[in-house]
Amino acid sequence: RCHGTAHIWIARANEKSGCEVLLQKRSAWKDSNPGCYDISSAGHLSAGDTYLEGALREIGEELGIHAEAEELRDLGLLEKVSHGVFYGKPFHDHEVSAVYLYTKPVEAEKLHLQESEVEAVRWMDLKECQKAVREGSIPNCIDIRELEMIEKSTTPYVYNDSNYKRVQYTRYAD
């Protein structure tokens, strides 16, 4: 059965490649991917939630950011299907994720991290992050397609760009 998730990337301008993203390090207590670097903020939708409502809730719960709807830029949808074994039982996941970009100024050291979810956060240059994810040089559970969506979006660090056109990315995982 398919379920929805909201993925919120926090980005800011930098001089190196033009953009850097805020990564969260998942809590060591998480069932899945403990201690791995991940999306700035993400979570499953609650019953009746829209993607946007879920995104606003998650960024508030995990990082203490009280964003407004117009501050989240919709980058599109991603579909992911995965199969495996989780705690000795077959695991089948089919999710559709709405990917958002938040570019208002954020000071990582002033965030209020939800300890049960987030161990730490760090800024990383977008190009370096893409390379690290492709090479597996940092422990991560990041879908490279999301970093590509950020890169392909027009000037991702410009807040509320009215010339932006919604792009939908959909591809099944192997």
Predicted regions mapped to residue ranges:
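Conserved Nudix-box catalytic region and its N-terminal flanking loop in Nudix hydrolases
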Residues: 1-7, 17-62
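Secondary-structure boundary elements
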Residues: 15-16, 64-68, 107-110
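Nudix hydrolase/Nudix homology domain
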Residues: 35-37, 41, 78-174
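Short, solvent-exposed loop/turn segments that connect beta-strands within catalytic domains
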Residues: 13-20, 89
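A generic structural motif
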Residues: 11-13, 103
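A short coil-to-beta-strand element that immediately follows conserved catalytic motifs
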Residues: 66-77
